[in-house]
Amino acid sequence: TTWSRGLGDVYKRQNDKSLPRMMSIQNPYSLLNRSYEVGLAEVSIREEIGCLSYSPLASGYLSGKYRNGKFPKGSRMERDFDFWTRYRKPNTEKAVEEYYKISKKYDLDMSQMSIKFCEEQEFMTSVIIGATTMEQLKTNIESVKVKLSEEVIKEINNVQKIYPNPCP
């Protein structure tokens, strides 16, 4: 891809000129946006340039609070609806519903499952979490204790095959 070639070019120029090397790249990455895997992940792994992912919960969609098109009063989607067009795509709700079913099937918190999936990627250096409330922060931090089984990963990857990157 263009981004992976560009990243590779930057890395090569840094080496050619003995400049300090790039250590990380900050990109969005979530169950709804795995586009980093197309080209950039390979360069990240090969050149040891870690990804610092932001929006692992897709602005709250992967917490489950916006399921079925409902936007709780005072939520960012209710408050700033016109700003968040990235997530209003044809397959967003379908993918979210499938991820929700996986989390329930395996007795996982949907937010924690989503964050942990990001964290476990080989190219990932760190996952930048955010929270509006202390309860959300505690839930997100607790994701470090979550273990995703091979079955969970397989089911997550199957959703990606059916609804690839609904919110790039």
Give the positions of each predicted feature.
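Glycine-rich, positively charged active-site loop/lid region within alpha/beta enzyme cores that binds
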Residues: 20, 43-102, 164
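Conserved short secondary-structure transition element at the edge of the structured enzyme core
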Residues: 56, 87-145
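Short helix-capping segments at alpha-helix termini
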Residues: 14-21, 105-107, 147-148
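Glycine-rich beta-alpha junction loops
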Residues: 29-33, 55-62, 117, 133
